[in-house]
Each structure stands twice: as structure tokens, then as C-alpha cells.
Amino acid sequence: MNTPKEEFQDWPIVRIAAHLPDLIVYGHFSPERPFMDYFDGVLMFVDISGFTAMTEKFSSAMYMDRGAEQLVEILNYHISAIVEKVLIFGGDILKFAGDALLALWRVERKQLKNIITVVIKCSLEIHGLFETQEWEEGLDIRVKIGLAAGHISMLVFGDETHSHFLVIGQAVDDVRLAQNMAQMNDVILSPNCWQLCDRSMIEIESVPDQRAVKVNFLKPPPNFNFDEFFTKCTTFMHYYPSGEHKNLLRLACTLKPDPELEMSLQKYVMESILKQIDNKQLQGYLSELRPVTIVFVNLMFEDQDKAEEIGPAIQDAYMHITSVLKIFQGQINKVFMFDKGCSFLCVFGFPGEKVPDELTHALECAMDIFDFCSQVHKIQTVSIGVASGIVFCGIVGHTVRHEYTVIGQKVNLAARMMMYYPGIVTCDSVTYNGSNLPAYFFKELPKKVMKGVADSGPLYQYWGRTEKVMFGMACLICNRKEDYPLLGRNKEINYFMYTMKKFLISNSSQVLMYEGLPGYGKSQILMKIEYLAQGKNHRIIAISLNKISFHQTFYTIQMFMANVLGLDTCKHYKERQTNLRNKVMTLLDEKFYCLLNDIFHVQFPISREISRMSTLKKQKQLEILFMKILKLIVKEERIIFIIDEAQFVDSTSWRFMEKLIRTLPIFIIMSLCPFVNIPCAAARAVIKNRNTTYIVIGAVQPNDISNKICLDLNVSCISKELDSYLGEGSCGIPFYCEELLKNLEHHEVLVFQQTESEEKTNRTWNNLFKYSIKLTEKLNMVTLHSDKESEEVCHLTSGVRLKNLSPPTSLKEISLIQLDSMRLSHQMLVRCAAIIGLTFTTELLFEILPCWNMKMMIKTLATLVESNIFYCFRNGKELQKALKQNDPSFEVHYRSLSLKPSEGMDHGEEEQLRELENEVIECHRIRFCNPMMQKTAYELWLKDQRKAMHLKCARFLEEDAHRCDHCRGRDFIPYHHFTVNIRLNALDMDAIKKMAMSHGFKTEEKLILSNSEIPETSAFFPENRSPEEIREKILNFFDHVLTKMKTSDEDIIPLESCQCEEILEIVILPLAHHFLALGENDKALYYFLEIASAYLIFCDNYMAYMYLNEGQKLLKTLKKDKSWSQTFESATFYSLKGEVCFNMGQIVLAKKMLRKALKLLNRIFPYNLISLFLHIHVEKNRHFHYVNRQAQESPPPGKKRLAQLYRQTVCLSLLWRIYSYSYLFHCKYYAHLAVMMQMNTALETQNCFQIIKAYLDYSLYHHLAGYKGVWFKYEVMAMEHIFNLPLKGEGIEIVAYVAETLVFNKLIMGHLDLAIELGSRALQMWALLQNPNRHYQSLCRLSRCLLLNSRYPQLIQVLGRLWELSVTQEHIFSKAFFYFVCLDILLYSGFVYRTFEECLEFIHQYENNRILKFHSGLLLGLYSSVAIWYARLQEWDNFYKFSNRAKNLLPRRTMTLTYYDGISRYMEGQVLHLQKQIKEQSENAQASGEELLKNLENLVAQNTTGPVFCPRLYHLMAYVCILMGDGQKCGLFLNTALRLSETQGNILEKCWLNMNKESWYSTSELKEDQWLQTILSLPSWEKIVAGRVNIQDLQKNKFLMRANTVDNHF
């Protein structure tokens, strides 16, 4: 047979008909319900195996890219093939039931014989579809088919708005039984079908012990033509397409608009489907892997085969079921005859219908249905199974015939529970645990082996509210371990301590209320409070309520009084009765005892008076009694009443408590979720009471979340990536953190290893940044890690994409509830925002919102900000500041609020919304409050829609994907886009240049700077000029530049500071992820490299590392080709890796990466000495060639060549520094070659900036190596270049760069006076140029010079500016260096600018900061300075702690001032420790001293150390020598240090040297507590400024290094 081609008009009625069988579409039914019809036909039941397992595989998938859409594609690929076969053979698909379908061939009885043959042929062809195929998800799809024939009844039932139908009869039972007998790839005929078929045509085999038979194959007679046979059969099929419609699969495709028929058919289709019926992408739109609750209801009848008997019962049951579902927001998805009985598949949580307390609703609904249906006449047994979890909800089938259905293990489980546990309501463990209902509402059931269910877990019978309340069930419940600390809740506990103090010293009641959303840890706070509240004469009563408590009158007070009276521990009512009698005998007449019967479940005789009393009067009598009892107790004890989940306090209990706090002194502490509805008047009165303290609980702070993760994993340390993911994802909510952690453990992506010290770790690229977040030391000491050797660290398995991880079901469910409660327009905005990412701009959102105007978007955004879906921020700094700290807890003064006039409240709300709209307009950044909401909303998009949206975003962002106007709009990797063509938009570069010109920007190639000429002679610095004259000329030039910058009307300085960081965050980062989502890996790689380069510019090594790892994954996916663009990307990748390694001080790794990059850039660096000297010779000739102006004849390099040359200069600039670190003799030649290659490469670029940088590097290299003539020459050449520059734009920046670099060079060489002169000018330039990073560097270098030169007034002024920069720009380096200098002032200058405690607090607070942690120099200096402080105080335990931390950072060698400052401080600490060892006559003191002296000598000998550090190093060497008794060497080193200090102008060191020299050679001994006495008298800077302390007297506050005698010999 030929497969017909499908073509039809897509009217709405056709789309509705696609959800229904022909039996309904063409049926003519009476409007009365129930309605019965009878006919004959053949039934086919097809059961498809493998789909449930596939659903489970997708629902438990780690990543968001394996969603429902892929699943529905796979499902429908297979199911549509079956549907097509059925339709081709004339069948009518009656129902889809998950992964099964029921088809009907409706014909006259006399035609059954031939039609059965057709159906068998169809069945065999269906098997043929699946026989040899192994499907794409690795799942083997197979089918089982049962056939039956005979008399069939149809029942139509429903109400005015909804209709359902069932097929009933022996044939229906037979087809189900036949399918159950079938094995994979079998076709089973029911006994009746076998009787009615043409037996001569079928080869069968018998089924053991059954009358049914199995079909082997058809055996038609010779010359039998099946096509002709089938054509004859189609004449008996009333709705088989023929004639002009013969190419259609289904005649219903030809339906024309018919309002009456359409209205009739709509009743059979779910409302959520009808809402979307106009959406032509309906099939995918409603397809989700979604957490839902399944309620499977089975009704068994006394006589199932008689439709007229069971019809009315089904109608009655349906009417009640649908009314109850409407109340609880559930829907009937399917109704069908299931084995024995009629089954209703009800679902809670369909798309758009997710509500809170879904599980409770489902159970209550199930119980209601059970109770009602059990009473319906003709219904023999009611069985209900309830299961919760992720299932596939979506449209399954073929384009012309499909249905909305649910598939998944939980659907199967609910069905099996319903059949294996008849006559009761059962539920699974997920429903039991998630309902939060009391345990006594359930009873655990014995396990049964259920078909198709491997492991059901514990199953429960749901009783509902039929059991009596049991005492002792209301105690506080918390899963926290006893020794588990309460993290991050000090503020909340302080509120309690303060209120408790008020309660104890006053004679009035106090109420403390903690309000917080679920998951914030309210129960843990109460558990801690219960422990802290314990004391003499304190009576603590703690109870926990639940949803049911709210509906039980006086329940809270019942539990309270049961505890007060000691009844909660009584095991029998008689014991309770005796206790009660003893307690109330003096307070209550015996005839009133029976008042206590109902409330305390006792059995006192009922008196006549009480029997006549009204319920209200009984309640009042009880309250009077309870008040009397409490009045007696409070005289002897302080009552503290703790209530968890107080939102469930019933109104009667609220009234009693309100009266209680007015009458007696009692302390009530409650935790509660925000009230959904307005609370009762008594509750409001309690909240507004003058003695009520109402606290809204905030989130836990990031540091505490980090500690929680370590404690929960039982490790001492976690990776930064894991910490960031859990910290950001949890939003500081403990429950979210726990769920995310469980999700990671479930997917087995966490790896645990034994702790390894930093020194022993063999550093590779993959472990460069591991184990960065440690458990807070105090917690480490008091909790889980007593055995240091057994400490573990946790990191992630390689290749895990945390950004794409699908959220845990529990958190997804919370987000779906929020989404489904929104208006459709709000949902659409949230979903569009989710495509952009966690953070987005209003401009981009407006671009992708379909058909919205700006006013509408702003109004919707304001509403969503008010609803805590979004936060809004004015700029990136505001956002980053907010991300560092979660919203803390705060107190709400409801009493004050209630006293305000209520007039104009509505007006006030409108005004507030308008203000919010204005705020949104001003804000540049919007961010999801909860990352899980963004992920959940993102997953709701279809794949094609998602791609289209990502493409839209990418096109919009692409135009701005470059550096800011301040930085002249370049690439972060110079000339990157000229080398790699990654643009989506058709705009060519010429057009862009024209646009740039029209906006007043000069393109890069137009700048004068690009063509740099090498001056022919020293026009500016004639040879006869002295160094002093040259110095004067340089300083005057910088002064001239500064004057012009300050006074010129020209556009010399930028109007705003650098915005590159903003652009990186809101343009380039999202753009890379959009390309990644689009599968454009080459474009994504381009932007990941740009991002890594940008982060390196911003000194964020960790983030650069992370994005290079992202790039590495993409590099592996790209097809290997030899194109220059791909080679350049690889070279850039390795050069950036080299930069990261260099910045981290991993110089061996850096060298390897940089060499590899140079090789790819066609600039091979030699590996052996022969090649080395050959290269040196070649580079010398090249340099001679450039210097002699021969190179100027060649045209400027092209843009691609420039990109290559710029990369080479970066690599070579780092390489010469790396080789300079080495003590090996031949390495100086490698360093010389590298710096020469850098200079020649820079000259080839013909770019002034590159040439100047290279000259200054060449000068510094020779300066450090001691070649005076060479370094001076190239420094002068660099200066000659800047004299030629136009003083605007980049020219000004080059001048500032030269000034700053000269400051570094002069400082490191020890020319402090000149460094100060240059530094003050460089500082002013960078301040005017508004570049925070450069500004910071100039402040640091100048402050270091001023400190060494002891110019304290100027130093304090510079430190003030450094502090201002750190605060206004949120600049962590500035703050860290500020405190580093403050520690130096404390240790060496003799006064206090910031206290030691403040400096220490900064270290504790920021040592795990992402940027600071991976900047080894500053932390090394801070740790070492603190270690020195403790060594001077002889607090050796603290010394070891900080010294060891510093020691771990020593291997990270970087050629920075901070690193060498840090290492000199570290060595000083070790020298002080040596003094301790010698004093204590330690065995290894001699060896330690010798090793220390050797290390100090090596540091002095190393070129890169710089002469400025030599006075301190010689000073320390002198001290080591005097400690070891070598007076001669000590004198030599002292004199060298003094001479160098004098030459350099290092007054700080010179004074200290003289004082120590005098002390060492004097006969007087120093006091043991010398430093302690000194720090107690250290003056503050304020005292010095006020003139109360003479600045000259500060010298006496310097620490004197202790040495006993000069002739101390070992």
C-alpha cells in the first residue's frame, strides 16, 4: 500500500478534531447524559514498551538541553508511525493511554471476518516498524498487540461544559486480556476474535492454558491481492478517505467551520488545550517534563459488562469527581475501562495550574472522592492511588490524531497502587513526605510485588482526619544534628536574648515573632532558642503545628495546656484523668470535670449542668479554668511558649493567647510563614501589641552558606566553582542549598579527596584554582574536623556545566507555582527574560518582547519587582555590591504602622507603584531574584523558539561587543575581529567605520599613533646633557601635559570613566552564552577568549581561568582545520593561559603555555643553546635593521598581521620576566633573547604605544641586570617617542603609562626621590583619565615610596585617596593595599593609622575574595605582616597560623612590588622565629639559620628582586649573623644596608638599622615584653596632626630585634 500524502485546511475545528476519534467527530448523540450507543467492531490494543524508561531518563537528566521537546520528538516519531499505520488501514484511534493506544474498526457484524484480516495485516506491519531498529536514546522500543472483536457499547457522560466517552463490553475486556497475554512483538487474538476471523488466512499457535491464540503470519491463497481486498473492505468503513480525499490520512481533516459541531466537540477537550488551540505550535508548547501529582481513581461495579447498569453510576461519580477537582484545581486527563472497572486519571499541577499545597489538595480530594463514590449505588469497590513526581505532560500521537497525556513511572505507580491495594486510598513516599500532614493521618502498608514497578519505596494508606489527635505529636521537629551549629543567625538570636532579658526583668508578657518563607530555617532558630531559654524556674513548652491544626478549634491551646499539665507523656486516658484530677481539684467543682473530656480525651462522668450548657459557654468555662491554672504556675515559674508554624494557629487559640498576654506575664515565641489571607482580629491584635517584637527573617549570608556546604559535605574545603554555584543558586536560603547539593550528589558530580598541602600539590592547569573556599576556622575546630589528617576536600568532576544544570524538582516546583499564578503577560515577560539570562537590560528585553510597547513593559517590570521576581539596579557596581550580601533580617513595627491614618491607602499603593516604575526606568540592570526561576522559565521554551530568541539577542548585542568609547571601542584582544570573522549581521566593516565617523570617532588606523617613527637623532636629549638636566626636562614635560589636561578646552580627558566592565557583564558575557545555545561554537569561542582577556585586564585571574576552560571545551569540538583564524584562536588561547599561570606565579606552567602560543604564532622560541645563540644573532641584526630606518620603507602591517604581532609581544614580555627569575646561568641569555624579540616585534607593528612599552621593558631588563649604558639609552628613546605624540586620546594615555612605568622602574631600582616626583604626576594623570586600575597602581607605588622616605603627611594624604577609591569603586586591591600599608605603619613607623584589629578583620573578611585570593603578592604581604606582629608579641601559635598561610603563597612567584614586599616580610618573620629557636636552644636552630641566610642571599642575588628591597634583606642577613655569632659578617651586612639606604633615600630602613645596630652592640638587655609595651603607647595619627606628639619622637616606637651578645657562638 502507498502511504497517502497529508494535505488539508487548518481550521480550528480540524485542530479540535485531531484530539478526538471519528466515533465522536461523526457521532450523533442525544444531549441527555449518560447516553448509550451500541455497535460491532474490531478493537486493537497496542502497548509500547520503552517510553516510560525513556521519560525517566529525560526527567532525571542533568542538563536543561535534554528537555521535554527532545522527548516528545522521540515519542511521536514512534507513536506517529503506529498511528499512521492504523489510519492507513482504516482504523479509528479511540484513546491514547500514556504509552498505549486503543483503535477501533467499526463495521457491520457480517463484515467482521474480513476486517479482522485487515487488522491482523496492520498489526504485523506495526511490528515490522520496530523489529530491527535500535533507537537513538539507546532504548529498545517494542510493541505488544491484542485484538478482539464483537459487540461494543459506548457510554457518553458529562455535564454542560465537559463530555467524556467510554467503550464498554466483553470485547473491551477481551482486548485488554489479549494484550496482557502478549509477549514482545506478539499479536494475540481473543477467543471471540479467533471464532469470527477467516482461519484459512492465518497461521497461529496456541497460548498455553488459554483459548486465545497467537498470530504467526498471514497465509493468503495463491494469486491473492491484498490491495484489491483492502479496497473492497474500505467500502464498509464509513469515514475512510476516498475519491478526491484519497491522499488524506483522515477524513476529519476536511471538516469545514461549523460552530454548533465545534462547540459540541470542544466539550471533549481539556480547557488548557482549548486555550492554546489557535497556536499552531500546540504540540510542543504544552510539552513539559513537569512535577505533578497523579490521582488514579478506579471504580469497580457489580456487573461491568452492562452499560445501561453502570452508566448512571459513572455519571454520578463523574459529577462529584469533577466538582471536587474544580475546588482543588485538578483536572481529569483520561477516563477508560481498566481491567475490571472504570478508571479516572486525574492530574494536579498541569501547565498553568500549579498551586501551593498541591500534595495536600490531592490527598484531600482523593479522600473526598473515595467517601462519596463508596456510597454510589452499583459501585462495588473504590480504589485510589496517589503518586507525585516528574512526568511527561504533552501531546502524543500524529499531526492528524493526537491527545494530551501523561507518561512516567509515577503514572504507572499510581495505577499499580490502585489495583494492588483495592478499597483504600494509597500514596507513595514522596506524597507522604511532601504533604506535611501529621504521621497519624497515614498507615504504612506491607510491600507487594507489582507488575512493572521495580522499587516503589514505602507506600502508605491515607486515613484523613478520622483519627483522634494523639498527645506528644506536636513537639518541635528539626532535622539538624545536635552538634550542628546554627549558621548565620546571630542577629536573630540577639533579638531573642534582648527580648528574654526584658521579659525576665519586667512583669509583663513578651511576644517574639519570626516571619519567614519556607526553607529559611525558622525551626532551627526555635530549636536553638529552646536550648538557650533553659534556666532555673523556666518552664519551656515547645510545639509544632501543621495545616490540619488550623481547622481544629482550640488545638494550639489544647497542646499548650496538655504540656503545662504534664499530660503529653501519659500513655493511657486513665493516667491523664488521674493527673487532671490532682491538678484541678482546688480550682474546679467535680461536676465540671467532664468539660475536659473532649479536649484531653478523658472520660469523666458527664453532669446534668454540663449537658445543658451551650458550646460557647463550655468554651468560656474552659478558658477561665486554664487562666486560673496558668496564674498559679507563673507565680512559681517563668513560662516560655514556643510555637513553630504559627500561621496554623486556629482563631480560638489566637483569642485566648491575646487575652493571656494582657493578663499574665508569659513569653511567647513563634515562627510563621507570611499569612496567605488576612489573619483574624486576635492575631492582628497580638502582632500590634506594644510588647510584640516582629522579625522578618532574611537570607543567610554567603560566607555562612559556604560554611554550611562544608559542614553538610563533611569536608574542610570546596572548590570556588561549587561555592559560587550553590551560593548564587540558593540565594542564601538553607533549604535551597540543601536541595541543590542533593541534586549534585544524585548526579554523582562531586569528587572527594584527601587534603593536600599547597607545597606538595603538583600544579597543573586543571588544579590551578582548586580548593579555594575553606570552612571557617572556628567551625573547623568545634565541629567535624578533629582529626586533621582525615580532612577532605570536595570539587567537581571535570566537564560539568553547572550553568546548564537542570534545577532540582522541589525548587522547580516552587518556581512553577509562582509562574502559574501570574497573568499570561507577566509569564511571557519572565520567560523572555529567562532567555537573556540571570541578569539583563531593559533595552534587550524590549527588543525581544513580541509586540510590546515600552510603557507596558515598564509597568509589568515594576509589578514583578514588587512581587520579588526581579531586582533592579542602576549599574553594575550596585548589582555587584548587592550580590556580596543577601538581604538580612529586619524588625517590622506593626504597631507604629497601624497608628498611621488609613485614608488614602489605595492612593498610596498607586503612588508606590508609580515610584517603582520610575525606578525601573532609571535602572540599567534587572536581575532574577531567584536563579531557579530563570532556569525553570527557560526550560518552558520550545527548542526552535529558544533558538530564534537567542539569535535575536545575539544580533542585538553584537553591535556593542567591543570595548567602551573611553577605550576607543577596540577588541579586548587587539585586532581580534580582523583575524576571525564571527559577525552575524550583514553589516560590513566599511559601513561600521562610516557610522563611527558620523558619530565623531576616529577609526584606529586613522590615528597618528599607528605610524611611529624612530627619531634619527636625540633631538630632545642631546648627548652632552647631564642626567639632572634630562630629569628636569622629563618632569617639566609631565607638568606641561598635566597643565594642558586640566586647562585645555579641547577634548583631552574622557567625560566618564572606563565602562568596559559594564560592557563585559551586559554584552559580551551574554553574547557568548547566546552563541553557545545556538550551537555556534566558533563564535562562542571568540567571545570566551575576549572575556578571558577582559578579566585579565581587570586582574581577575579566577574568572579568566573559568572562561578559558569554557573555551577549551569548545576548542575540542571544532573541526580541525589549518585555517589561520583557528590557528590564531588556539595561539590566543595558550597565550591567555600563559598569562593566567604567570599571574598565579606558576612560572613553569606559564613558560610551557607561552612557548606553545609562540609556536602557533610562527615565532618559535629556541629550546637549546645552539639555537639560542643563533636566534640572538638574528634578532640583533633585525634590531639593527629597524634602528637604521630600513624598516620604514616597508608598508604598515595589515590588521591580521598586527593581531599576530600583538600576541607575540604579550608572550615575549612575559617570557623574559620568567627567565629572569631563574638562578641558572644560561637563563639570562633566554631572557635577553625574549626581551630583544619583544622589542623587534613591537618595532614591526609601527605602533608608538607598543614600541614605547618594549623600550621601557628593555630598559628595565638591563637596569636589573646592571647594564647602565643600555638601560639609560632605551629609557631616553622611550621619552623621545612621547615628546612626538599628539596630547589627546591615546596619546595622553601613553604619556600617563610612561610616567607610571618610570615610577615602577625608579622605585624598584631604589631611586625614591625621582620615583616620588614621577609618582605624584602619574597619580594626577590617571585620576583625570578616570581609570581605576591604573589609578590604584599609581597610588600604591607612590604610597610605598613615601613610606620608605618617611614622608608621613603626604603618605596619609595618598592613603586617604586610596581608601576613597576602594569605597567609591568597590576596588578590592585598593582596600587590601591600604591595609597592607597600615600594617607597615604599625610595624615600622611608630604610630597608628588603622588599628591592628581592623586590619586583621579585613583579612578574615576578604581572604576568600575571588580576586584577592588569586593575587599572591598582597595576601602574602598581609599574612606575613600579621605573622611578624604576633612574632614580636611572642604569640607563636598565631604566628605559625599566618606564617604557614604565607608559606603556601611563596611558590607563586610574580615580578611585582607586592610579591617582593611580601616575601621580605615573610623572611623577617622567619628571622624572628630563628631568634626563638636559638633562645630555646632548638636542635635544628643552626641548620635553620644557615638555610635562612642562604635564602636571603639568593633573594639579593636574583635580578628581579630589585635594589629597593636590598636594604631590608641585608638588614635581616645582619640579624641572622649576629644571632649565629658571626659579628664580622653582621658588620659587613649592616654597613651595606646602611650605605644602600643612604643612597636610595630609604629613611625608614636607615633609622631602624641605626637603632638595631646600637642595640646589638650595647650591653643593656631588652625587655621580654618590649613590643607589647610599645604598642600600648603607640600614638594615633590624629594625635600627631593635633601636635600632641612630635613626629620626630616616633623613632623610639620602632621594634628592636633582640640579640643577647655579639660573641654568641654555637
UniProtKB/Swiss-Prot annotation:
Activated by manganese or magnesium ions. In the presence of magnesium ions, the enzyme is activated by bicarbonate. In the presence of manganese ions, the enzyme is inhibited by bicarbonate. In the absence of magnesium and bicarbonate, the enzyme is weakly activated by calcium. Calcium mildly increases the enzyme activity, also in the presence of magnesium ions. GO terms for molecular function: adenylate cyclase activity; ATP binding; ATPase binding; bicarbonate binding; magnesium ion binding; manganese ion binding. Mg(2+) 1 binds at D47, D99. Its EC number is 4.6.1.1. It is a peripheral membrane protein. Its main location: membrane. One of its GO terms (biological process) is epithelial cilium movement involved in extracellular fluid movement. PROSITE patterns: GUANYLATE_CYCLASE_2. Hydrogencarbonate binds at K95, V167, R176, M337. It catalyses: ATP = 3',5'-cyclic AMP + diphosphate. Binds 2 magnesium ions per subunit. Is also active with manganese (in vitro). GO terms for cellular component: apical part of cell; astrocyte end-foot; basal part of cell; central region of growth cone; cilium; cytoplasm; cytoskeleton; cytosol. Detected in airway epithelial cells and testis (at protein level). Weakly expressed in multiple tissues. Expressed in brain, heart, kidney, liver, lung, pancreas, peripheral blood leukocytes, placenta, skeletal muscle, stomach, thymus, airway epithelial cells, duodenum, jejunum and ileum. Very low level of expression in bone. Its cofactor is Mg(2+); Mn(2+). Gene3D superfamilies: Nucleotide cyclase, P-loop containing nucleotide triphosphate hydrolases. Belongs to the adenylyl cyclase class-4/guanylyl cyclase family. Catalyzes the formation of the signaling molecule cAMP. May function as sensor that mediates responses to changes in cellular bicarbonate and CO(2) levels. Has a critical role in mammalian spermatogenesis by producing the cAMP which regulates cAMP-responsive nuclear factors indispensable for sperm maturation in the epididymis. Induces capacitation, the maturational process that sperm undergo prior to fertilization. Involved in ciliary beat regulation. PANTHER family: ADENYLATE CYCLASE TYPE 10, TESTICULAR SOLUBLE ADENYLYL CYCLASE. It is linked to Hypercalciuria absorptive 2: A common type of hypercalciuria, a condition characterized by excessive urinary calcium excretion. Absorptive hypercalciuria is due to gastrointestinal hyperabsorption of calcium and is a frequent cause of calcium oxalate nephrolithiasis. This is Adenylate cyclase type 10. It comes from Homo sapiens. The gene is ADCY10.
